[in-house]
Amino acid sequence: ANIKPALLTTHPFYKAAVKENIFICDEGENPIVIQFWDETASLIDFTKKKAVNWWQNKVTKYILSNGFDTIWNDNNEYDLEEKTAFSFFKKSKVKTSTLIPLQALLMTKASADATAKYYPNIRNHGVTRSGGLGIQKYAETWTGDNDTSWHSLKWSSSIGLGLSLSGIGLF
């Protein structure tokens, strides 16, 4: 199942999620609203324990319980142009821009943990589009949406070698 770390502002869960304070916020604790494809959305802040719990509950209820056993964490680059976005890391308020790889890692870990809890007797297999050091513990990655061409093969080979040097053997 392909899932994203952003919740559209038109999503039925959005208003309740704002009240639960699970999003990346500005200095005034208001959710940052970003352009997300052709809609607007807010990004879930996986440095917040309540956001991780919210995520895992939704993944379990709406995805895993419907028979899916693999989570594809997509669009988790956390490309925030908003410079006033803040997250909480180790009880300190920090600019989210400094935690971008961590957000992807924590999202992927939250998905992997929910899957492992729901399916304790199968080996977890997850996919992620983004992530930093340690991501290979929770999911494999892929090098993006390619086309069938020599050009794509050339760049995919280079990217694959770089990923392998970073400890990511599946790409």
Describe the function of each predicted region.
Residues 1-171:
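Catalytic-domain carbohydrate-binding cleft regions of carbohydrate-active enzymes
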